[in-house]
From Swiss-Prot:
Coiled coil: none annotated. Residues 208-444 form the DOG1 domain. It comes from Oryza sativa subsp. japonica (Rice). The gene is TGAL8. This is Transcription factor TGAL8. InterPro entries: bZIP (IPR004827), bZIP_sf (IPR046347), TGA_domain (IPR025422).
Length: 451
């Protein structure tokens, strides 16, 4: 076996060097060309488009790509290059004519390494993991639409807050209205006390004070009812629209009679005395209210013209009201005479035993008044008999209120809807003028100079 000599190998090497020199007569810069080649190599590896074509002009010291048997990163996450993609890579013409290295948008060169690979894996390429990550990121970035249950709960919370504010506002208004009514009631009590109109021990019973407050509220509500009825009459509404207002006014008088019925059994003297009415109204008071026959006379003046049939019905109702009034007046006068006989009996108190002054406590004053009434030789039977006769006043008060309501219903039946509307408006105007006259008399009448 013959081996080539050393001189032959040297000649072959020199001839090879000469041939390479002849192919590249211009020469190249070793460090710069190597840097550019490495940069292009890593760029192609980052884009996963390795070139399999033979590059025509490569330097001697160019290191070819070798198989990475032990990769530093897992290979299952990176896509496998296809031959079609490898063949599509552009060939490298030469180091002196290559394009410059890729740069970022701001002009700085891209930094290749673990950061770019991690960003590529995070974006996901064309895999399903990237699509899921993109959809998750879009859901996080986009505005969230609440579900119907949350929207319904928010709407319920807003509605509850609105109702709470309305209740608070109504409660504050109610407190303010109650304060005004209480101040007005205190003024009336002081005015009545100054005139010496209190009966008994000089104080109002709790039931009487409650009734006064209820009557004030009823007057305010009745004023609103009549205001609506008056507006409907002035606007010439048809009978179908007037009918509900007329029925409302009629039923509101029933509310007043219910308030009076609750007080009749507890304190009939308060109703009979008329302290809950104005000073001028008390002059026209009849057994705790208005006289039915006088009310019919007032109404007829404001609902004319009437037909003959209506005139006959009105006259009949007026005659029936007067008969009932005469009967009640006779019974009440008989009761008062009987009460006077009991009080003026032989067991009445002597001159040395007088009714206690009002400065005493009510319970003590009541005890002393009972002892004074029975007298030194009297008995408890006379006092009990007088109390029973006072309690019988409630019977007359109930019958008088029943006659008043009966008269109102009779007027409602015999009149048309429009006439009935004018009837209730006229009744309210009548009592309103009486109250205004009392207020005018109290505030404007001249006071005599003190002598």
């Amino acid at each position: 076996m013959a081996y080539p000599s050393t001189s032959g190998m040297i000649q072959a090497s020199s001839s090879l060097h000469g041939s390479i020199t002849r192919r590249n007569p211009e020469g190249y810069d070793m460090p710069s060309d190597l840097d550019q080649a490495l940069l292009l190599y890593f760029d192609g590896q980052e884009q996963d488009k390795p070139s399999t074509q033979e590059e025509p002009h490569k330097p001697l010291n160019f290191v070819k790509e070798t198989l990475n048997i032990f990769p530093s990163q897992p290979m299952d996450g990176e896509p496998t290059p296809t031959p079609k993609a490898s063949m599509s890579a552009p060939p490298i013409a030469g180091f002196s004519r290559r394009s410059p290295a890729p740069a970022a948008a701001d002009g700085r060169p891209l930094t290749l390494g673990k950061t770019s690979k991690a960003a590529f894996k995070k974006e996901g390429g064309s895999g399903s993991g990237g699509a899921m990550a993109a959809s998750a990121s879009s859901e996080l970035k986009g505005p969230k639409t609440p579900d119907p249950k949350t929207l319904r709960r928010l709407a319920q919370n807003r509605e509850a807050a609105r109702k709470s504010r309305l209740r608070k506002k109504a409660y504050i208004q109610q407190l303010e209205t109650g304060r005004i009514r209480l101040a007005h009631l205190e003024q009336e009590i002081q005015f009545t006390r100054a005139q010496g109109a209190f009966c008994g021990a000089g104080i109002l019973s709790p039931d009487a004070a409650l009734f006064n407050l209820e009557y004030e509220r009823w007057q305010e509500a009745h004023h609103q009812v009549i205001s609506r009825l008056r507006a409907a009459v002035e606007e010439h509404r048809p009978d179908g629209e007037l009918q509900p207002h007329v029925d409302e006014a009629m039923s509101h008088y029933g509310v007043l009679m219910a308030h009076k019925a609750r007080l009749v059994g507890a304190d009939p003297l308060h109703l009979l005395s008329g302290l809950w009415k104005g000073a001028v109204e008390q002059c026209f008071l009849w057994i705790g209210g208005f006289r039915p026959s006088e009310l019919i006379k007032v109404v007829v003046r404001h609902v004319e013209p009437l037909t003959e049939q209506q005139l006959a019905a009105v006259y009949s109702a007026q005659q029936a009201a007067r008969q009932e009034e005469d009967a009640l007046d006779g019974g009440l006068q008989a009761l008062l005479r009987s009460l006077s006989d009991v009080v003026s009996s032989s067991d009445a108190p002597s001159s040395s035993q007088q009714t206690p002054p009002v400065m005493y406590h009510p319970s003590a004053a009541a005890a002393m008044a009972a002892a004074s009434f029975m007298g030194q030789y009297g008995s408890y039977s006379n006092l009990q008999l007088a109390m029973d006769k006072l309690a019988n006043l409630a019977i007359f008060l109930r019958q008088a209120d029943e006659e008043r309501m009966r008269t109102l219903h009779a007027l409602r039946r015999m009149l048309t809807v429009r006439q009935a509307a004018r009837c209730f408006v006229a009744v309210d105007d009548y009592f309103g003028r009486l109250r205004a006259l009392a207020l005018f008399w109290t505030t404007t009448r001249p006071h005599p100079a003190a002598g």
